[in-house]
Amino acid sequence: VTAAIFITLAAHAAAPNTNAASNAQANGPSLITSAAGVRLRESPDAGSAEVGRLQLGLVVEELERSAAKARVGSTEAFWHRVSAPGGARGWVFGGLVAPFDPARRDEIYVRLASERVAHAAATFPELTELVRFLERATKEVRRRDALAELELTRLVALGRSLASFSIEEQEKPPYKPWVTEHEPEIVYSEPAGQWYVRADLYWNFEKKYRGLPVAERAAWQGAQTPLPGECEGYLPCHLYVQKISNGQYLKLYPRGAHSDAALANISELLGHVTEDMRGANPVFDVPRADRAEFRKTVAEMRAQLALVPARKKARVLGQLDAISRRFR
């Protein structure tokens, strides 16, 4: 992560713009930065000199506030002169900070994490800074549900950070150090040329927080996380992958928010298999030596669907029956 991401300590306090009226705040309220790499400026003007940068989720003390709002881009807000940990002082635009109340720390952290991870166009620096914030935040919250939300968001943000750079960039900074730092939590897929968060971390999370709404989301995340390697035409491998992903989700959450999508994923694969079986040169195969184990996997998949409503699972069960007959 580049040094610019983290707070740069100013060598001296940035003086307020003497031409801009401001409201002095003695023992002013606390604010929290709501974006990555927030610029700390010498005066309340977007064109003034930059004296430092503040990382996402940093709590600062407000010293002054501009008398009038200003417009930066499409946002209209006050400017705030702040004091940051380490002694840096300067002006930040109000669109990049939010009120912070220590008594509402859990709620504020969860909301900030949710807002930032929802930013679909987030860059690698923004995602790594989000991960850093969440690593700090999980040590500060008290409620179990808040901790769970932050832990899951951290895994999701980590996964997105790994997907934000190409195979050609993997050995270059800042990507290589990031991968090395998180190697215990990630796995590399040679065929895809990409790093993924280990799927078992999501399943372990689901078990740890089962009973909380966040556990269902973790199970779905685990089901959709790619696994390293590839199955090619080896059908037992394809079914095993479905069993430990979408099938496992349906076993745990047969009526869950993503149950229809999980069934559709399984059915899509099985549909390709049944269509392939009707061709002259089928790609999918089950060697005779592996058919006993294959039938066991099919039976386990059927069992995973036991509590799924009958009308919803009928298509998948029919596809499994057809495949079972083909590879007796």
What are these regions (language model features)?
Residues E216-H272:
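Flexible, glycine-rich surface segments
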Residues P99, F133, A137-E140, R144, ...:
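TPR/TPR-like alpha-solenoid repeats
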Residues G47-S48, E135-E149, F165, S189-Y196, ...:
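Short solvent-exposed coil/turn linkers within tandem alpha-helical repeat scaffolds
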Residues N23-G28, I32-E76, A113-A120, R132, ...:
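Beta-loop motif signature
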